[in-house]
């Protein structure tokens, strides 16, 4: 009988490991408390929610390292330990305690996913062997322990290759190498983080897809959420704009990847929650499994908030031995947790970078994380969600369009010119579009505004044409609003009654409504109408708001209920939208 549980917390905040693990740890502690279990937390970071009074029964502000944890286990004698709620640090610490024999010495039961399953997913060589047993495709790779082995592996696989460090978080030490010089430099960095390095054949340009899968001890499995990265493979998922649910997968692609994710979680024997990342060839249904995280991850926190399904809470209960069918859905309070959420909205996660604060850091994005945080936006359309998200980042942007110049001028190849020819570009687009930077989304906006085709931008960025079509739709609405710039001029001279006659002119009110539906703020609309030339922009935004209210163009409050309104929701989880 489990009466006392030790939870390894999220530890210090660092790039790649931030508030997401505080969120999952807090949820797990609440789940244990509900069961009347005494909880002990180890977390050196005092500025977290999980270390607040009343969340855990006892808190140790000690580093999440095997030596310190062993002393606390010897003193507290817990019955069980949870490893998957503190990110990579907690997972590595748990594996070390297991290998040292500390857990068996003090008779501490690992709750949820067995340690061997964690080792199978973290050790790159073992991981590939385990997936080969069930005929699941992985990226062609070789595990190496020396720089000499890395060089030999790269020669065998053929360039370009990607290097990945084992047991590392946030793509630490990973990078793409096109030649031997880059390889040796990257290998040196990777070995400084980990004793084992994986050399993989590069699949740059493939789509990156993620599934969040939950399994209980009775072998019941569900996929809670699937997500798609706007950027193709080659940019770390923590650096990319992520959309949930996926938007560009066909029905057969979606179900094929879902079935494989469930097959993997069953074969490895994970109990609780795990994250499966895929590379998918945009030209066929060919796929590769990139990695499996046998823990709550950044993506889990996003999936949890995006769907309203409390992943960490459920995972903690499953670790105690419950089945999915025995747990209540915390949103509806009537259905069980054994269901797959249905979403009638779109969620966008957008990273935030603060690269100006770090001296000498390249603005180029790659397979290693640089972002320091992220925002999540909810809308009824992709356009609305991405515009809301870009406003929320807090870096002075007003949305996808309507910003002052954010990138250097772009010179793209003209029709008929070869997209890969270096002669077609000046220096700026190489950094803006060909090589992704933290402002690439605004470089895409600028290229669309300059009249370049979706196909040209797709060739440069490898962003899916569906996303580019939606982004072009935002630019088209902005252009349509600019055709009504005479309204801002007339507003200076005309009294309200006469002005309203012009506002009511054919097509404008429909356009105003469409702009709001697709995520335009009053500020963006005022800027597109040219109010900036004549008025303070704060006042101009209020003018647009006044017009909207006059013609009843107002937002609705929508509820996130996990079941697309099939059952009434008891939880107040809300968002505003114009449809």
Where are these regions (language model features)?
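Intrinsic disorder and flexible/low-complexity segments
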Residues: 513, 517-518, 523, 527-528, ...
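ATP-dependent carboxylate activation and anion-phosphoryl transfer catalytic cores
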Residues: 3, 9, 22, 27, ...
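ATP-binding N-terminal substructure of ATP-dependent carboxylate-amine bond-forming enzymes
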Residues: 1-133, 145-148, 389, 533-535, ...
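Acidic/histidine-enriched active-site and ligand-binding environments that engage anionic O-linkages
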Residues: 152-161
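N-terminal low-complexity segments that are often proline-rich with Ser/Thr-Pro
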Residues: 407-431, 525
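Short, basic interhelical loop/turn and adjoining N-cap
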Residues: 460-469, 527-546
């Amino acid at each position: 009988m489990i009466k006392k549980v030790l939870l390894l917390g999220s530890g210090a905040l660092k790039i790649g490991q931030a508030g997401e693990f505080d969120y999952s740890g807090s949820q797990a502690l609440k789940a244990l408390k509900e069961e009347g279990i005494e909880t002990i937390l180890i977390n050196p970071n005092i500025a977290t929610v999980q270390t607040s009074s009343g969340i855990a029964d006892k808190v140790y502000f000690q580093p999440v390292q095997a030596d310190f944890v062993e002393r606390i286990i010897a003193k507290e004698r817990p019955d069980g330990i949870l490893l998957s709620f503190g990110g990579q640090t907690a997972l590595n610490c748990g594996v070390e305690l297991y290998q040292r024999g500390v857990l068996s010495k003090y008779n501490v039961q690992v709750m949820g996913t067995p340690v061997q399953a964690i080792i199978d997913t973290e050790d790159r060589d073992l991981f590939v062997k385990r997936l080969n047993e069930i005929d699941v495709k992985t990226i062609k790779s070789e595990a190496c322990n020396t720089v000499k082995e890395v060089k030999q592996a790269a020669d065998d696989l053929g360039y370009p290759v990607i290097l990945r460090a084992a047991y590392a978080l946030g793509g630490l030490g990973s990078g793409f190498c096109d030649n031997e010089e880059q390889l040796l430099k990257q290998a040196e960095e990777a070995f400084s983080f980990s004793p084992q390095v994986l050399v993989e054949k590069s699949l740059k340009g493939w789509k990156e897809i993620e599934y969040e899968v939950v399994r209980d001890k009775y072998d019941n499995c569900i996929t809670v959420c699937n997500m798609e990265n706007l950027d193709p493979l080659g940019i770390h998922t923590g650096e990319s704009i992520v959309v949930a649910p996926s938007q560009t997968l066909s029905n057969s692609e979606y179900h094929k990847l879902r079935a494989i994710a469930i097959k993997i979680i069953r074969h490895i024997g994970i109990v609780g929650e795990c994250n499966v990342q895929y590379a998918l060839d945009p030209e066929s249904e060919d796929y590769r499994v990139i990695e499996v995280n046998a823990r709550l991850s950044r993506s889990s926190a996003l999936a949890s908030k995006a769907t309203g399904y409390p992943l960490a809470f459920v995972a903690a209960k499953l670790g105690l031995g419950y089945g999915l069918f025995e747990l209540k859905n915390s949103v509806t309070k009537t259905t069980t947790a054994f269901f797959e959420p249905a979403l009638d909205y779109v969620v966008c996660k957008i990273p935030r970078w603060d690269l100006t604060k770090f001296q000498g850091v390249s603005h180029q994005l790659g397979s290693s994380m640089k972002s320091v945080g992220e925002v999540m936006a909810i809308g009824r359309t992709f356009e609305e969600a991405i515009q809301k998200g870009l406003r929320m980042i807090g870096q002075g942007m007003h949305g996808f369009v309507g910003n002052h110049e954010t990138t250097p001028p772009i010179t793209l190849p003209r029709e008929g010119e070869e997209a890969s020819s270096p002669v077609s570009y000046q220096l700026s687009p190489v950094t803006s579009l060909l090589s992704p930077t933290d402002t690439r989304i605004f470089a895409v906006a600028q290229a669309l505004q300059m009249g370049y085709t979706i196909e040209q931008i797709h060739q440069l960025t490898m962003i899916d044409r569906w996303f580019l079509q939606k982004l072009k739709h935002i630019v088209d609405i902005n252009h349509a609003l600019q055709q009504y710039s005479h309204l801002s001029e007339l507003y200076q001279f005309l009294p309200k009654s006469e002005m309203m006659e012009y506002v009511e002119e054919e097509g404008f009110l429909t356009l105003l409504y469409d702009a709001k539906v697709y995520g335009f703020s009053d500020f963006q609309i005022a800027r597109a109408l040219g109010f900036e030339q004549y008025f303070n922009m704060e006042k101009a935004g209020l003018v647009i708001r006044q017009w909207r209210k006059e013609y009843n163009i107002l937002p609705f409050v929508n509820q996130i209920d996990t079941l697309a309104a099939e059952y009434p929701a008891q939880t107040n989880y809300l968002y505003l939208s114009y449809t």
